[in-house]
């Protein structure tokens, strides 16, 4: 019995010894898989949001979900909003919205807006719509771009992507959004 216990301990020790390099490699990433140097000038970053991250601005706007998409089940004069969470001073270059527009009559329009902290005023920065897209049940994309579209001033404004549904059902569905942006030099200089 002692021999079996000793043999079992030896086998366990060997297995642990073989597993340790594998476990430690989880923490040590090779240089090729690490994020690029944040101090690189002109580096373009991207932040991706799922459709489920859009929020109804009113409880009157009811909605359903399908996969990662969100769609209206009622159409009051209310909107879905995706609040942007990017660093102060970030320059938004492109906002790409992933959506489904399978309605032959109505187009979808999406807005990039700024608003004051008190939510008393807002301003439209850019708009994109689906008028140039074919009707399709497949996920498609529309984009707003500029050089930059906007430089974020989080001290005095909030920023969001806004969509006001005009029909109900999955023929119009938000699936996600991706923002491409650069960071200000002051953030890049941090250790």
Please place each PLM-identified region on the residue numbering:
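Exposed low-complexity, polar/acidic, P/S/T/G-rich flexible segments that act as propeptides
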Residues: 166-191
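Noncatalytic modules at the cell exterior or secretory-pathway interfaces
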Residues: 147-169
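Sec-dependent, cleavable N-terminal signal peptides
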Residues: 1-31
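Extended extracellular/luminal ectodomain segments enriched in beta-structured repeat modules
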Residues: 77, 86-94
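Glycan-recognition and processing domains
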Residues: 29-75, 189-191
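Extended, low-complexity, turn-rich repeat/linker tracts enriched in Gly/Pro/Ser/Thr and Asp/Glu
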Residues: 88-90, 99-109, 118-119, 167-171
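Short edge beta-strand/loop segments characteristic of extracellular beta-sandwich folds
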Residues: 83, 96-100
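Extracellular carbohydrate recognition and processing domains
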Residues: 122-150
């Amino acid at each position: 019995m002692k021999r079996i216990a000793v043999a079992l301990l030896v086998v366990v020790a060997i297995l642990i010894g073989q597993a340790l390099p594998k476990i430690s490699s989880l923490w040590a990433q090779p240089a090729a898989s690490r994020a690029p140097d944040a101090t690189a000038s002109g580096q373009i970053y991207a932040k991706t949001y799922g459709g489920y991250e859009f929020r109804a601005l009113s409880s009157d706007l009811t909605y359903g979900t399908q996969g990662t998409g969100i769609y209206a089940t009622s159409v009051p004069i209310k909107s879905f909003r995706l609040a942007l969470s990017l660093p102060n001073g970030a320059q938004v270059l492109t906002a790409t919205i992933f959506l489904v527009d399978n309605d032959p009559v109505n187009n979808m329009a999406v807005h990039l807006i700024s608003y004051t902290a008190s939510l008393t005023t807002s301003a439209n920065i850019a708009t994109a719509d689906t008028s140039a897209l074919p009707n399709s049940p497949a996920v498609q994309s529309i984009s707003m771009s500029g050089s930059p579209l906007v430089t974020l001033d989080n001290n005095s404004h909030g920023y969001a992507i806004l969509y006001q549904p005009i029909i109900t059902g999955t023929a119009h569905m938000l699936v996600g959004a991706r923002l491409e942006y650069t960071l200000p030099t002051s953030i890049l200089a941090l250790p």
